[in-house]
Amino acid sequence: MNKIKNGWLSQIRKVISPHFDERPDVEDISLLVIHYISLPPEQFGGGYVDDFFQGKLDPTIHPYFEEIYQFRVSAHCLIERDGKVTQYVSFNDRAWHAGLSCFEGRDKCNDFAIGIELEGSNEQPFTAEQYQVLAALTRDIMQAYPKITLDRIVGHCDISPGRKIDPGQYFEWERYLALVKKGLDKK
């Protein structure tokens, strides 16, 4: 179990993103949004997600980077293919991950959501390590933010339909939720 103190996970890598601001109400954190990211598309590793979330992406490295390097986005955490977690923004702050979004009639999901990126794509399955780590991280988040319940865990596609497709066709919701529940039963 990873302790969360003042919105930060203990014992994991931190790379601070400047792309965040204060939440309107920390007590309102009540949604977990699952995303995927790969930079360049369909490629893993390389540290480009760190650069992107810090506003330091070099547009000369890859043609796709020319399109996105000026975007100001972040997520709270990234889970890499090997299960390594990096935190970019305190859970108590508003990361800029959801964009135009709506959940149960409420707009601006960044105001009340935590965003977790999985290193991945819509073209291949996620790893066993990612499912294990995501489930454990989810349980830690649920313990620290009890308004996040199993029915308030969604994909980016669910809050931005027609605009986003992540976590994509290969994300195994049943597998992930079973792992989350299995760990909750032990507590």
Question: Model-found features: residue ranges?
Answer:
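Conserved, mostly hydrophobic/aromatic
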Residues: 34, 116, 134
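Residues immediately flanking
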Residues: 36, 118, 157
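N-terminal catalytic cores of peptidoglycan-degrading enzymes
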Residues: 1-107
